[in-house]
From Swiss-Prot:
Homodimer. PROSITE patterns: PUR_PYR_PR_TRANSFER. One of its GO terms (molecular function) is orotate phosphoribosyltransferase activity. This is Orotate phosphoribosyltransferase. The gene is pyrE.
Length: 222
């Protein structure tokens, strides 16, 4: 489930301007040569983080999902959950958020979870889903706390089948998460939206990458 076309196009434009989204030839962890690269770590100042939170907030509200709080898995998800919580307040929605530590503390407040008490319907927020491992860990922590995962909210759905350059799976990481955990995955943007954006662009530097992106999707996409 992706955001509406207007929000998606604006987000892609924003990611390009911030150099979070770039085109070229990039080797993925799976060993595939991708014509594009998305690095949310480049949203690294106050202005970008504030805008990013608004995109997450809008995608979440457009989904009409019923939720009680936000959860950010360490490490990237921590900042994303906080930024989204702040952005939601601008629309009159004040919800708590929490996150986890990579290692439990045995002093002070102790434990693995930090922030608000984890309860009710919880939205897990991250940048992308690569293998679903982080989602599985988050689901376990949330359920052990007595709460219920409601959805996963990400910035970009690559719409790419799992596996490597040779062995290609039959479904994407997002589809695997939806199937395994029974959770909807909401994305601000996805590969189909990116291709539509490139097709409609008047910038020849961008449209020149469209054939490579199209070929990549035909080979690895869902």
């Amino acid at each position: 489930m992706s955001s509406n076309n207007s929000n998606q196009d604006n987000f892609i434009r924003f990611a390009l301007e911030a150099k979070v989204l770039s085109f070229g030839e990039f080797k993925t962890k799976a060993g595939r040569l991708s014509p594009y690269f998305f690095n949310a770590g480049e949203f690294n100042d106050g202005a970008h983080l504030s805008a990013l939170g608004r995109y997450y907030s809008k995608a979440l509200q457009e989904s009409k999902l019923q939720f009680d709080m936000l959860y950010g898995p360490a490490y990237k998800g921590i900042t994303l959950a906080a930024a989204t919580a702040i952005a939601l307040v601008d629309d009159g929605i004040n919800v708590p958020y929490a996150y986890n530590r990579k290692e439990a503390k045995d002093h002070g407040e102790g434990g693995v979870l930090v922030g608000a008490s984890v309860k009710g319907r919880v939205v897990i927020i991250d940048d992308v889903i690569s293998a679903g491992t982080s989602v599985g860990e988050s689901v376990d922590l949330i359920r052990k706390a007595g709460a219920e995962p409601a959805a996963v909210l990400i910035a970009l759905d690559r719409m790419e089948r799992s596996g490597n350059a040779v062995d290609i799976g039959d479904k994407s990481a997002v589809q695997a998460v939806e199937q395994e955990f029974g959770l909807p995955v909401i994305s601000i943007a996805n590969l189909a939206g990116l291709m539509s954006f490139l097709t409609a662009s008047s910038d020849t530097q961008l449209t020149n990458y469209l054939p490579a992106v199209k070929a990549y999707r035909e080979k690895y996409g869902i």
